[in-house]
Amino acid sequence: VDGVRINQCKVDRQGRLFFGTMINEEQGNFLNYQKRIGSFYRFTMSQGLVELKDKVGLSNGIAWNNNWTKMYFVDSFDLTIYEFDYDLMTGNISK
């Protein structure tokens, strides 16, 4: 996508790649993050690219709890840590 870049990525225990995108800094000043053109994705060889969350301002931290039933994703523009139910078998998150 034009104007965005990958900012943060992590791999789960099953080898699935999760990553967030954000506006490319070359697009202007910090206020451009309000455009929320970033997204949060999962990538696997079998399923390809799957968008999990849209309208991300500033993609940051990705983590799971100890038993892999919760996933955490940070949108620093919102100063928010999102918590999702996480299915380790499928890689799906609650919406």
List PLM regions with ranges.
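Short loop/turn segments immediately following beta-strands, especially the blade-tip
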Residues: 84-93
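A short loop-to-beta-strand structural motif that recurs across blades of beta-propeller domains
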Residues: 31-32, 38-41, 80-82
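Short loop/turn segments immediately following the C-termini of beta-strands
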Residues: 22-24, 76, 86
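Beta-propeller fold detector
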Residues: 50-54, 93-95
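Beta-rich, blade/repeat-based domains predominating
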Residues: 2-17, 23-24, 34, 39, ...
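Glycine/Thr-rich phosphate-binding loops of Rossmann-like dinucleotide-binding domains
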Residues: 19, 27-28, 81
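Short strand-connecting beta-turns/loops that link adjacent beta-strands
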Residues: 14, 45-46, 67-68, 76-78, ...
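Phosphate/pyrophosphate-binding betaalpha-module
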Residues: 42-44, 92-93
